[in-house]
Amino acid sequence: MRVIVLGSGVIGVASAYYLAQQGAHVTVLDRQTGPAEETSFGNAGQISPGYSTPWAAPGIPFKAVKWMFQHHAPLAINLDGSMWQLQWMAQMLKNCNPQSYSQNKERMMRVAEYSRDCLKSLRETTGISYENRAKGTLQVFRKEAQLEAVQRDIEVLQECGVSYELLYQDDLARVEPALEHAKDKLVGGLHLPNDETGDCYLFTNALAQKAKELGVNFQFNQNVEGLVVEGDEIKGVRVNGQVLKADRYVLAFGSYSRDFLKPLALNLPVYPVKGYSLTIPIVQPEFAPQSTVLDETYKIAITRFDQRIRVGGMAELSGFNLGLNQDRRATLEMVTQDLFPGGNMAEASFWTGLRPMTPDSTPIIGATRFKNLFLNTGHGTLGWTMACGSGKLISDIVLSHQTEISTEGLSLQRYSTAA
């Protein structure tokens, strides 16, 4: 079977790898010069199934109003002039209730936990390396109210069978020794020992090489213009003025998937949520993290690679604007220096990317009303966490194999738009 995968971020490359592993003849098309050149390039580096939590949660509307008046707020809304931005925010608000939150979190954790298993198996069979560590994730709290509120998350973790440890101030340095100097600023934390870290860019490029060894044909610097449609079937992809044909097609264009599907009258509820990161060389290892530390107050992740610290976070609703906002950099620097001042900030690189976010925070993985078009997008901030599981899942769906986990609630059909 011939399959064309559109997109070479971590989701597209994982899809291509698992399709080829199961015998498909795969071609990957992308406008970029190589794999993982956009959203997968500079993300926070955490692989955290236990923190697969919907942004649409009870209390978020009230918090969003508060954040509008804070200098170092984790969320910023800049109207982009589109009706779609307002519609997307309205859909998200509809999910800010306990019932929707629980349903969405179950779906997210289902994919994320499966993805961790797939990644582990991939490492064992291929020996793939990407500055990876398996030392868990530590969420730290600066306020007693945060420590008290985490009980709701603990209940969900218990229901899902996720290992955790609730820590108090004097326990934090046992997990992250460099926090000893900063413990007076913190009241406690939640440690998930089974979470992992790694450089998504390195991983995606290494996996692309392994996909090539399975016969995957990567075509970069391509102007992918659109799909050729006949009835309920895709007949080809228009690329550089020509038409490339396959038996089945997988769309993994991230935030750009929605506009790509507009000519097909498929209303894909994916909005680009802008995030930022700093990559900082380590000069004092004793003041650097061992794994990932999440600052609950500022919603920022600080992750250890080999000789670098990756600091990522923020959520900015501003359309497809890729400008680097220096106020966001100031926030990332402030939080890093406050907790882990072991890096050379003068040599840090500043980056931004667009996360493809759905209103319910759950990715869109599955078929459409076109019998040979499939979607693998909308992973938001969890593309790295969910990549391998999403790739394996879509490969099974495309090839009509029995999936290893339930696909309930993952396809476009969960929205009112015809899929």
UniProtKB/Swiss-Prot annotation:
Q: Which PANTHER family match?
A: D-AMINO ACID DEHYDROGENASE, SARCOSINE DEHYDROGENASE-RELATED
Give the pathway annotation: Amino-acid degradation; D-alanine degradation; NH(3) and pyruvate from D-alanine: step 1/1
Gene Ontology terms: biological process: D-alanine catabolic process
Record family assignment? Belongs to the DadA oxidoreductase family.
Q: Write the gene name.
A: dadA
Relate the protein's function as given in its record.
Oxidative deamination of D-amino acids.
Pfam families linked: DAO (PF01266)
The protein, known as: D-amino acid dehydrogenase
Domain of life, source organism: Bacteria
Q: Which InterPro entries does the record associate with it?
A: DadA (IPR023080), FAD-dep_OxRdtase (IPR006076), FAD/NAD-bd_sf (IPR036188)
Q: Which residues cross the membrane?
A: none
Kindly list the cofactors needed.
FAD
- Which reactions are catalysed by this chain? a D-alpha-amino acid + A + H2O = a 2-oxocarboxylate + AH2 + NH4(+)
Q: MF terms per GO, please?
A: D-amino-acid dehydrogenase activity
Q: Which EC numbers does the record give?
A: 1.4.99.-
User: Known SUPFAM superfamilies for this protein?
Assistant: FAD-linked reductases, C-terminal domain (SSF54373), FAD/NAD(P)-binding domain (SSF51905)
Q: Which top-level enzyme class is recorded in the Swiss-Prot or TrEMBL entry?
A: oxidoreductase
Alphabetized UniProt keyword annotations: FAD, Flavoprotein, Oxidoreductase
Any idea which positions bind FAD?
A: 3-17
An annotated GO cellular component of this protein is: cytoplasm
